[in-house]
């Protein structure tokens, strides 16, 4: 029998408030457990418009119909509409995922900014970003996070070294076929990477 791992990245407030409850019902019905990884900070989904000039962005938008998928309000968060702090409005559903036996971890503080601006951010910004996510996780679950997965499988030497400070059991920051321990600047890191 093969083992399958199911990773659920919750990127938006809408995903937290309607996606989590829907998925929990489906998973419960089929007796399936998953790993839920939450975005905790501002839902800046509207800022994804910065991607408009990237290759493939417009075709993806025409395929997925983001207004139908996310709703107009979500599409405006962080631009014309204030960005809500996701965990402040969705703690109940985040906790429910863990209560129902699913693994929980950190996906992001600010998903859109990390995804789009990682290569342009300083070590100070990244440290603050990770700390805010870990603080929010602790506020929701009353304990430290043991897992983190990065938005869009984006990482670099700085992010991998910063994660080492948190004593995670594992992270999922890249694509690949088997778990490994990254080597950064000649140092074998202690945080196991489980690619997807």
Model regions: which residues?
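Catalytic alpha-helical scaffold of carbohydrate-active enzymes acting on polysaccharides/glycoconjugates
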Residues: 1-147, 152-193
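Active-site donor-binding loop signature of nucleotide-sugar glycosyltransferases
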Residues: 196
């Amino acid at each position: 029998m093969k083992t399958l791992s199911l990773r659920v990245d919750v990127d938006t407030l809408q995903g937290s408030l309607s996606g989590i409850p829907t998925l929990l019902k489906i998973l419960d019905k089929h007796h399936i457990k998953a790993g839920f990884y939450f975005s905790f900070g501002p839902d800046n989904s509207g800022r994804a418009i910065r991607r408009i000039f990237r290759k493939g962005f417009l075709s993806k938008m025409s395929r997925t119909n983001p207004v139908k998928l996310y709703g107009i309000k979500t599409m405006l968060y962080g631009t014309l509409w204030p960005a809500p702090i996701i965990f402040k409005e969705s703690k109940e559903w985040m906790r429910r995922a863990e209560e129902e036996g699913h693994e929980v971890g950190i996906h992001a503080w600010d998903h859109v900014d990390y995804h789009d601006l990682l290569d342009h951010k300083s070590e100070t910004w990244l440290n603050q970003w990770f700390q805010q996510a870990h603080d929010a996780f602790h506020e929701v679950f009353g304990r430290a996070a043991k897992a983190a997965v990065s938005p869009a499988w984006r990482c670099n030497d700085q992010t991998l070294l910063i994660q080492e400070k948190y004593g995670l059991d594992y992270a999922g920051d890249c694509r690949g076929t088997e778990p490994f321990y990254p080597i950064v600047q000649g140092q074998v890191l202690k945080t196991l990477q489980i690619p997807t």
